Amino acid sequence: METVTKNGYQNGSLESLCVNQRDPLSWGVAAEAMKGSHLDEVKRMVADYRKPVVKLGGETLTIAQVASIAGHDTGDVKVELSESARPGVKASSDWVMDSMDKGTDSYGVTTGFGATSHRRTKQGGALQKELIRFLNAGIFGNGTETCHTLPHSATRAAMLVRINTLLQGYSGIRFEILEAITRLLNNNITPCLPLRGTITASGDLVPLSYIAGLLTGRPNSKATGPTGEVLDAAEAFKAAGIESGFFELQPKEGLALVNGTAVGSGLASMVLFETNVLAVLSELLSAIFAEVMNGKPEFTDHLTHKLKHHPGQIEAAAIMEHILDGSAYMKAAKKLHETDPLQKPKQDRYALRTSPQWLGPQIEVIRFSTKSIEREINSVNDNPLIDVSRNKAIHGGNFQGTPIGVSMDNVRLAIASIGKLLFAQFSELVNDFYNNGLPSNLTASRNPSLDYGFKGAEIAMASYCSELQYLANPVTTHVQSAEQHNQDVNSLGLISSRKTAEAVDILKLMSTTFLVALCQAIDLRHLEENLKSAVKNTVSQVSKRVLTTGANGELHPSRFCEKELLKVVDREYVFAYVDDPCSATYPLMQKLRQVFVDHALENGENEKNFSTSVFQKIEAFEEELKALLPKEVESARAAYDSGNSAIDNKIKECRSYPLYKFVREELGTVLLTGEKVQSPGEEFDKVFTAMCQGKIIDPMLECLGEWNGSPLPIC
């Protein structure tokens, strides 16, 4: 099969450039790109992100590679240009110079720009110089408290994407300029670009003009060096090892540099890499939520989701099903539900039970948007396009960044929906009316009156969620006509990308807070199990000692109370009474006493005889219990605090363990209590920083390492 690269100059005929007869509208290519699971796609992204070299040829750049170059500013990931692209780039550059010599009238080469393209000039180089000058209209706010500079990671992403676009040989620019930008990237020299001022149609004119300004040595151009030092253009060139000196732009070259969507699509690529990771994390968090809530795993049953047909939902359910399959928490919950089916509602609430249905559409939106942006960063998106094969310049509008604006608006909606689910789950988790026995606010102190746990975190989560939902409002509905009504519709791609980057940051705050809360809940379930065991053993011990025999050693009717007394211990939530286990106002002692009362009522005539009265045993039982139980509870608590619990933590038997282990052991977070000095925010910061550094990825994928990509069989 013939392949076509670089404007028809290698390995292909002119005819094959025109129409792909097998897939003339490229829908087939788009559909093919969506095959396979989302998780597999995320794994491929991670592999791409970690490659030490990004080789650019114009057509195979991935969003993960863009994110990698953007995020690795220490020189450990390098950019290489494919030499096979050089002939095509040179041919289009030569064509522009030849057409200029012949007097051919071409937009941006011999004409003015935009609404003033009726003007004409033969001074092609001077025209490009003026283009860069008037586009340097950004504001940096130097000396003010507010920063108006684009983050250097986003600038690096833009530089990479612009090189990739120009390598395809349709733009009329010298290969040497692309090599110079590559040198800047590889030496971590980053031009300073304004944060605002682009509508991403005609591309990102204003910010990209500052890259061109640095290349041409404009006196107002600035860059940051490897350690954050501010450099002028000459210092930047020296630091990057560019020995050729500043570029005198030839006709069309200034336009080639600025008339593209690279800033918007570069930032969109960074955003989407993180969004895809956070989408998988949300599936894991939902599964762990089911574990600590004693949820019913049937919500993941494949038949339910197969009948709904949506692939995102099917995959989300299958991933949760895999995590919950064989989970020690699910086994314990199943036993609990079988023993006492009325202890909790028949069905879990929507935030748990419908989490696959909620997350599925968001994952589909994120996947589609990822592919859309990946097409954009491999597109030729300036104007005019130089078609050497037909000896003409084609005037069109590929600079219109609508795929960016629309994709980012849609992704922001998906992010807001994921955040809303996490907030709903978090709200259930910290509320003792809904969390199936966990303490209010997930408090872990001996004295709950001096520990309010995650109350502050819940307020913060409400704040995050509110801001996230506000950010979900579309940017693309706020288009203003620009540039003398020439740019009367425009994409606002970079603005939408920036808002989506904000949304991603907030979702990371929410994911961090929720993950730490889930680890707190896991530890509380562990503590709960050990405390309940201590209570149960003590009640059993006291029952045998006090209730088995009467005053004369004869068997006493109250001995039959023990079974029901132990059932009370099983049924009562430990954290509802454990701070003062023998208090008559707490449910444990009240329910234990009720057992005696019920048996006394059934004891008939024997109850009238002091020696066989069940009721008469209440005082002795309670006095013995009050003497022993507080000590046993404290002993169990002390053993837990010292890491010597009688019962091990169930999480170690679960597929979600790698994530818990990462948070607790690698990051060194602890069980939060009012008895310790650590604030919740200190622990959140540890996890948030690790999440921003990408350290969450490996433990997250380790949780899913055994998944074969399919739901469990329906049987």
UniProtKB/Swiss-Prot annotation:
Pfam families: Lyase_aromatic (PF00221). InterPro entries: Aromatic_Lyase (IPR001106), Fumarase/histidase_N (IPR024083), L-Aspartase-like (IPR008948), Phe/His_NH3-lyase_AS (IPR022313), Phe_NH3-lyase (IPR005922), Phe_NH3-lyase_shielding_dom_sf (IPR023144). (E)-cinnamate binds at residues 259, 347, 353, 383, 455, 483, 486. CDD domains: PAL-HAL. The active site is at 107 (proton donor/acceptor). There is a cross-link at residues 201-203 (5-imidazolinone (Ala-Gly)). GO terms for biological process: cinnamic acid biosynthetic process; L-phenylalanine catabolic process. It is an enzyme of class 4 (lyase). It is found in: Cytoplasm. The modification 2,3-didehydroalanine (Ser) is found at residue 202. Pathway: Phenylpropanoid metabolism; trans-cinnamate biosynthesis; trans-cinnamate from L-phenylalanine: step 1/1. Homotetramer. This is Phenylalanine ammonia-lyase. It comes from Populus trichocarpa.
